[in-house]
Amino acid sequence: PAQDIYSIMRAFNSFDVYRNNENKFIVKTYRAGLINELKNLNVELVLSEKFETFWKQMSNFSTSEDLKLPEGIHAEFREYQTKGFGWLWFMYKYGLNGILADDMGLGKTLQALAVVQKAKEEDGPAPTLVICPTTVVFNWESEIQKFAPTLTTLKLAGVDRKQFFKEIPNYDVVITSYALVRRDINKLKEYNFRYVILDESQNIKNAMSQTAQAVKKLQASHKLALSGTPIENK
């Protein structure tokens, strides 16, 4: 029926589906929710084996009992932290970006460090950029020293920070502030990061702000936003 065709075309248009050179329709991973909508419209789908596995795992997500915490993390994880880490690792494996939103004091930094450490152990070293409020920079340094001491850390702060830009590829974690990322974006955007982690990410909730615009210019395989209180998560 014409109505069904209209519904299918509307779904394709709204979910950024496009056709490649092999005449196949391509769906971005983060638009995977389209699958259910198309199935409800009785569209016959042929999915790649990798995407089929991803879709099944995402639809019935639970932290695998086989998933081990990284060896370099020195901490006892509570059950909810293990689940959070499992979700972050799932997103990492499938190239997804995400938000870890939880009340303050429940270990978001630890969970983020765990996935950074796990990625290093599984895939080798690559720099992660952590952007946080100036008042939290020391906390990140302290947490890394305590929970992930094998991660090498570079803090970009002070008037002499620019001389260290060339060292960025040699470190596991690079820490800077929202205030400085605005000033240094022309240099920072030259580097390819494994992760860009935004702590207290409400700092970029205004998409038109200079800070948000600067962050959008950063190159990273994965982006993770951390947010702390219910009012900030809205």
Which positions does each model-derived feature cover?
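ASCE P-loop NTPase motor core, strongest for the SF2 helicase catalytic module
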Residues: 44-234
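Charged, low-complexity intrinsically disordered regions
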Residues: 1-57, 125
